[in-house]
Amino acid sequence: MNIVQNSIFLSNLLRSSPVFELKYDHSCELYRMSTYSTFPAGVPVSERSLARAGFYYTGAKDRVRCFCCGLMLDNWKAGDSPTGKHRNLYPSCSFIQNLSAVSTVGAASQPPAPLSEARSTHAQSPGLERSSYFSASYSSFPVDPVDFRPSPAMSPWRAGPSCVTMKSEEDRLCTFQGWPLAFPLPSALARAGFYYVGPGDRVACFACGGKLSNWEPDDDALSEHLRHFPDCPFVEGQLQATVRYTASNLSMQTLAARSRTFCNWPPRAPVHPEQLASAGFYYMGHSDDVKCFCCDGGLRCWESGDDPWVEHAKWFPRCEYLIRIKGQEFISQIQASYPHLLEQLLSTSDNTEDENTESPIVHFGPGEYHSEDAVMMNTPVVMAALEMGFSRSLVRQTVQSKILSTGENYRTVNEIVSDLLHVEDEIREEEKERAAENRESDDVSLIRKNKMVLFQHLTYVLPILDSLLMAGVLNEQEHSSIKQKARTSLQARELIDTVLVKGSSAVTIFKNSLQEIDPMLYKRFFVQQDRKYIPTEDISDLPVEEQLRRLQEERTCKVCMDKEVSIVFIPCGHLVVCRDCAPSLRKCPICRGTVRGTVRTFLS
């Protein structure tokens, strides 16, 4: 028998309200709430917050389960946030994603998503307040399938008349002299249009008269106002004044949410959390790493005197949040103060560094390395991986990569072991490539390593093609296929790739043909070994059409030969590939140096 159907009170309530048509399954928040009738009394987490986070009671100890993703949690401790734990442990859950979306200003302006996260409740009429059902442990109906918006037909939830005397935010703020809670801040409530009416934590909107109470720490005043009273004229005015922008992390869109992430901010860090949160940054939980909620740009290694807004504009000038708050003029001034930022970045890299030298991915400040390294490497999960026999240096580098990319350490042994095995496979593949290169003849290895430079400057392709055809290196089909390419650079690329595939004998014939047909290029490439700075031909005397064609070739990606180059490799500084081809390259195709990082450029 269904629990809700067994309840006389709930049945009478549903029959008396024609608006309500309740589903009898765990997707309904009211139904989930009804499963907590036998929930242990000593658990330090409220049944209401568990039901709101998508959990229903399993009947065993304090174990609960998500109706959507199946996540089971127990052993609740004081201070635990059911919504936060749900989001952290199973972020792909569609229910918890909807909760996150509703909590933002942008999302709240849309029709309410099912089972929203808001923890405040409409003020109840005296008749309903006397009922134990509408206690602090549960405070809202589900949005779907129940119509939860205030309407004249639902008198217990009807918004009161507007209060013209509270139109001023300052006047509203003065009413919070006896505010009983530390959250939300009175300034945030007043800014959201509310003034304090009591009793308890009840507030009312000056414009629509809507009343809310039973506030919890995670509540955002404006988001709650939007969710419960979307037709409020004050809310509509706020939405019209809001410039929409795309946020990379919706859960960090509010200042309060970002500020809460700084609870473990290093006390000796020279920049205050308030400054960082105001500039759009939230704390990643490691060292002094922060990220912008909007553009996802990350910054670290803060120094005394750093201004978060200036650093934001310096490194991420296209951030929509930055542009909206500070304006384009401020960003342009900061950018003008650092005209050679890209050159400085490239100059700090050592071009002569051995590609096999192990370099740490995360750079710690003075005196921080040993303590943070110890914390990072001595978690139970990491220690378990070390006990399996993985190299400590390999584990350290893998953990650092994880922290750098996600802001947190590994949570499970399976996850870290999977990544370690993947890294070992990559290392073995690189060793095989090096061994294969060593087995090849010197000429084959030379051309393979520098083929990008060679085919960029190989202009006499057709005579060499004919020579290789006569020598039997190419057949008629290969000769015709290469010859039909529209541009010389494409012909050169396919010719060299074909020769390399055929092996050392084909390379020898190609080398002899090049010596005969283009002795200048042969001398510079094979004799002088001047492969880094082969001068380009003076094209000033060529026809304008030919000059344009060659300039276009120089700006074309040397991998796909289609899109425009836009990625600079670090540390070598070569600009030869587009943004789509760059992620697949571990080594620069020009100098064969290991790619440590990339910078996107915009050619004017």
From Swiss-Prot:
Gene3D superfamilies referenced in this protein's UniProt entry, alphabetically: Death Domain, Fas, DNA helicase RuvA subunit, C-terminal domain, Inhibitor Of Apoptosis Protein (2mihbC-IAP-1), Chain A
Omega-N-methylarginine, modified sites: R130
Positions of BIR repeats: 29-96, 169-235, 255-322
Phosphoserine: residues bearing it: S140
ZnF endpoints (RING-type): 557-592
InterPro entries: BIR_rpt (IPR001370), BIRC2-3-like_UBA (IPR048875), BIRC2/BIRC3_UBA (IPR041933), CARD (IPR001315), DEATH-like_dom_sf (IPR011029), IAP (IPR050784), Znf_RING (IPR001841)
Post-translational modification, as annotated: Auto-ubiquitinated and degraded by the proteasome in apoptotic cells.
Domain of life: Eukaryota
Subunit and partners: Interacts with PRSS25; the interaction inhibits apoptotic suppressor activity. The BIR motifs region interacts with TNF receptor associated factors 1 and 2 (TRAF1 and TRAF2) to form a heteromeric complex, which is then recruited to the tumor necrosis factor receptor 2 (TNFR2). Interaction with TRAF2 is required for ubiquitination of IKBKE, degradation of NFKBIA and activation of NF-kappa-B. Interacts with RIP1, RIP2, RIP3, RIP4 and USP19.
Entry's family note: Belongs to the IAP family.
The protein's name in its UniProt record: Baculoviral IAP repeat-containing protein 3
Gene coding for it: BIRC3
